[in-house]
Amino acid sequence: MSAVAGSPLPYWRLSGFYFAYFALLGGVAPFLSLYFESLGFEPARIGELVAIPMLMRCIAPNLWGWLGDATGQRLLIVRVGALLTALTFAGIFWRLDYWWLAAIMALHSFFWHAVLPQFEAITLAHLGSQSSRYSQLRLWGSVGFILTVVLLGMLLQREGMGVYPMAMLGIMLLISLCSALVPAPPQQPAAAQEHADGFLRRLWRPGVPAFFLCVALMQLSHGPYYTFLSIHLEALGYGRGLIGALWALGVVAEILLFLVMHRVLGVFSLRALLVASFLIASLRWVLLGTLADHLSVLIFAQILHAATFGAFHVAAIHFVQQRFGERYQGQGQALYATLAGVGGALGALYSGYAWQGVGATLTFGVAALAALAAAVILSLRLREAD
């Protein structure tokens, strides 16, 4: 049952949307750079093309978040955004030159990044006081991611990269279908304090600006990972099937963490979880930059994805929920997505130029320093009670 007005929680419909949405990410994260490489683009151009959707993530969520909070029509925004994501991406079948692809990346991602922050707010509204169950819904996104990574990796190894755009379009249409099946959440009256404290007052509370800065640093540190890990592993002699399996391993670890995350939240503070996630991320990037040719080290580094994404994301979602309340949840989640987009775009850009100029080890080294800096900032700026 949902904690809101005794209404039943639409578990499978919410979970189904997460499954489809992150299935698309499972096609993008490991394989988009390989697709652009198959078209003959050099690393700097690949980094730019991968950065464009991340730049849209800096713009789109705040616009859609404001619109969602102002109108209350978050579910409509999700449905329209999902449909337009697919329709605009279909332009990729027309031309494959750099500037056309840049336009396609910008246009479809403007709508794609409208979707998730609003859906997170919808999910939290359905959960009500049972927000600790969020990870039990979100884990199905990880299942969708891992299935796509494995199955698409096998498909691309057999059929080649030419089938990649059609596979992506199919997943986008599935997202649109799943969004149509999700019911609107029950309406909750806003607390008096929510009306008294505006969005900006909540944003400038102690520790909140530092949190959002560190969100950007976390995603910046993931730049080499999401943009060049597959290329890095191919250069080290790993086959595409094994590369897909290694991506999937990280998500398996993430799923296992999601299964117990509601208990972890009851033991550790959000501050402790966030700081630990950054410290582990720093270690992970050092390992990937220096010892990825050792399969055992690579496997261990991928298992650490449970912390660098899983624990960090759940702790961050709860932090935003606590700081912004129901009234400003759409804008709070949108700002989280935006700062993640800023960091991700900067990470993709710097990794593209650094990879070409100084190589994998130093590129991952910069990522490790960014994560370490964020750990220090949060340990100093967040209270232990957080």
Regions found by a protein language model. Give the residues of each.
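Helix-to-loop junctions at the C-terminal end of transmembrane segments
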Residues: I59-Q73, L156-Q157, L256-L270, W355-Q356
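Hydrophobic core of transmembrane alpha-helices in multi-pass small-molecule transporters
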Residues: F19, T88, Y98-V115, A216, ...
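Cytoplasmic helix-loop-helix junction between adjacent transmembrane helices
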Residues: A106-W140
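Structural signature of the two symmetry-related core transmembrane helices
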Residues: L76-A90, A272-L287
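Juxtamembrane intracellular "pre-TM" segments in multi-pass secondary transporters
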Residues: S2-P8, V182-V215
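Symmetry-related core transmembrane helices of the 12-TM Major Facilitator Superfamily/SLC fold
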Residues: V163-A180, L362-L380
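Interfacial helix-cap and linker-helix signal at transmembrane-aqueous boundaries
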Residues: F36-E37, L67-G68, L139, M154-E159, ...
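Helix-loop boundary and gating motifs at the non-cytosolic
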Residues: A5-M54, V208-V215, Q219-L246
